[in-house]
């Protein structure tokens, strides 16, 4: 409802008090009022009951300073009532002195007399700083000729003077003496004003003489407050006057209470930022200090704290300083006595600490990377040499075995030469050429099988030299015995022996059956393998073939025997290890004669078919 009234008022509409109270639910009187009263506070002076605590904030001074009962309006602005002062505090005889606080620095006696115009003011005193006589302390005193002028001056509390809200209060003789003799100045007044206007602070009910200062740097304010307010608090003025300044903070030209509250909160926050937040005092005088806007105000405040010499707090602090001054001369004596004996230990400890600080890695030593790299390279080189030696040793062991393909190839070359010689001397038919071709193929296949079984790792090396072997063997020296000479000398003997051999089977059986060679072939093959000779092959031949074929075969057999002996000599000479020599020689000889036996069977079969 109050908000609606405010809105109407802002629009320029006015409302009577009775209507306003009726809307608010209060009990209004039965009398009627003018629609536009000059001062509704005069009309509600004797009004009893609940009254609205919300006030209009007008720019004009229509509702200014009417006396209102504070019990009826507990939170009314100060501008709506006269100051409620305990008359017991008022002086009974002149001088009637009023204390003026929160004065601007540029204030003069004439400006103060102008502020209290219409009042019987007799004198004005403005104390100055002892260190700087040109600078005011921020407070003063005004003496009035009569008590009514003093009461009127007290009603101007929290009025504006030079952009500051000054504090007007009653000053007794004890306060004046304390201010003048001890040069306490405006700090005491400031703290006393804060105590009076701060509704959050808890007042002290005992006098200054009963208790020492309680709150550190602000103890001087407590002293003055205790001495200044003890009587009126004890007389029951505590509930009256102390609660009054809580509402007196809002006094200035009908200003709205809520608006002033916001500024008060801002001033408290600002003052706490300045550094006075430790004090349990509200806004009031301190808030007006902030309006002054001068940093010198706070600097002077702290300077005066340092200059004060009247309080027991200062005496106590001076005693502390004296004890502190006596302390330092004794400290070196106490410190020098124990240091004289363990001086070396301290030096050793310092050196150990310095060494620890120097070696941030503790006991670790630096690593020579170059030496480490050399060691690693040497080790790797040794390992490589060792591996190379291990690879070379198997090569040396395998060298004797690598000679086997060479003597086999020589053997095959000797056979081929003997065969070519015998074939060139023969005048046989195409059956001989077919037998030679089959013999070569069987020899090659058998040699490949034996080589693969005996040496798997050397099989690739043995195959490539075959096409190159005729180039290597071409310049070889001729054999010890000439095969042509031996062939020309041996045929008559061989023919005789063959004739005698041929007679033995004919005498036993008469005629030779045509199927007999094929039946006796396997038996002859076994005899050839056991004996290691191919001489019985001549028994199967026909006597009508002539000495040419028989001599050619005998010569071929003898050349094979000679080649086998040569191969055995060549194998036994270069091989240093006997365990490897024996199985190699047996296997090679077995494979060689097996090939010859197969060739012999092929010849016998060919002859049988030819017959």
From Swiss-Prot:
Gene Ontology BP annotations: eukaryotic translation initiation factor 4F complex assembly; formation of translation preinitiation complex; regulation of translational initiation
GO cellular component: cytosol; eukaryotic translation initiation factor 4F complex
Compositionally skewed regions (Basic and acidic residues) per UniProt: 79-89, 173-203, 211-271, 285-328, 370-420, 439-458, 521-530, 551-583
SMART domains: RRM
RRM domain span: 96-173
N6-acetyllysine PTM sites in chain numbering: 365, 586
GO molecular function annotation: ribosomal small subunit binding; RNA binding; RNA strand annealing activity; RNA strand-exchange activity; translation initiation factor activity
Start-end of Acidic residues biased regions: 599-611
Keyword annotations of the record: Acetylation, Initiation factor, Isopeptide bond, Phosphoprotein, Protein biosynthesis, RNA-binding, Ubl conjugation
Compositional bias annotation for Basic residues: 1-13
Effect after changing residue 203 to R: Found in a renal cell carcinoma case; somatic mutation
Modification type Phosphothreonine: residues: 412, 500, 506
Compositional bias segments (type: Low complexity): 348-359, 421-435, 584-597
Residue ranges with Polar residues bias: 487-506
Post-translational modifications reported in the UniProt record: Phosphorylated at Ser-422 by RPS6KA1 and RPS6KB1; phosphorylation enhances the affinity of EIF4B for the EIF3 complex. In response to mTORC1 activation, RPS6KA1-mediated phosphorylation at 'Ser-406' and 'Ser-422' stimulates bicarbonate cotransporter SLC4A7 mRNA translation, increasing SLC4A7 protein abundance and function.
Cited Pfam families: RRM_1
Covalent cross-link Glycyl lysine isopeptide (Lys-Gly) (interchain with G-Cter in SUMO2) as placed by the record, residue numbers: 343
Residue positions where Phosphoserine is found in the record: 93, 192, 207, 219, 283, 359, 406, 409, 418, 422, 425, 445, 459, 462, 497-498, 504, 597
Chain residue ranges for the region called Disordered: 1-37, 66-93, 173-611
PANTHER family registered for this protein in UniProt: EUKARYOTIC TRANSLATION INITIATION FACTOR 4B, EUKARYOTIC TRANSLATION INITIATION FACTOR 4B/4H
Subunit structure: Self-associates and interacts with EIF3 p170 subunit.
Protein name: Eukaryotic translation initiation factor 4B
Organism name: Homo sapiens (Human)
